[in-house]
Amino acid sequence: HFEVVAFAEEEGQRYKATFLGSGALIGDFKPEWLEQKDADGITMRQAMQHAGLNIDDIPKLQRQPADYLGFVEVHIEQGPVLNELDMPLGIVTSINGSIRMQCEIIGTASHAGTTPMDRRADAATALAELALYVEQRALTDGDSVATIGMLQVPNGSVNVVPGRCLFSLDMRAPVNAQRDALAADILAALQRICEKRGLRYTAEESMRAAAAPSAPAWQARWEAAVSSLGLPLHRMPSGAGHDAMK
């Protein structure tokens, strides 16, 4: 028989935990996640209870792999490729592995008018230099992608040289070795840029997800199904993470 499942919170936006629903399904929901707090100081436990969920039921969601023949996830592409090709379906060969980091560059806040350019410890210009490196490094690495999606200058002001920058790093590639090399090069660039400019930095890894190649037998079934509809086959990696990775 078929079991249809709608998962909760794959993205890990509100809390620093991803794949909550699918993690529970495979018995990988970590109890310590419940004590994490969001930006408003609300714990995950409180949010779930407010939504009417029974936390004690989470362990009951676990399924046994021996009871299942396979898992298939249908998802929109979330990208431009299929639209540009005018194709309705794509066959995913692998889900990219990813690493996420929360980082900070620390310089010295100083007056924008009275601090000469050659005496500044500007955290924002260091981050700008890093951002350009991130873009070029990923561009020259096949299907790799890298993004600085969050950027903040705490207590920033129009007339103050930025003393701190908080930012995120999201790095993805179809295979783990490629992903790891990308992350290592970007962190090395961060260190090099900060040393050159006399700045300090921190970098904390918040997520690491292994690349998930599609099972060959199931991929063959998908391809047969698409062909039976008279549609052309287009094989492609999935740059976005999905619950199927679990």
Where are these regions (language model features)?
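Midchain, well-structured core segments that form catalytic/ion-binding scaffolds
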Residues: 9-10, 14-16, 20-176
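A structural signal for isolated positions on well-ordered beta-strands in alpha/beta enzyme cores
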Residues: 3-5, 202
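Short, flexible active-site-proximal loops enriched in glycine and acidic residues
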Residues: 2-3, 15
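Metal-dependent amide/peptide-bond hydrolase catalytic core
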Residues: 102, 113, 124-246
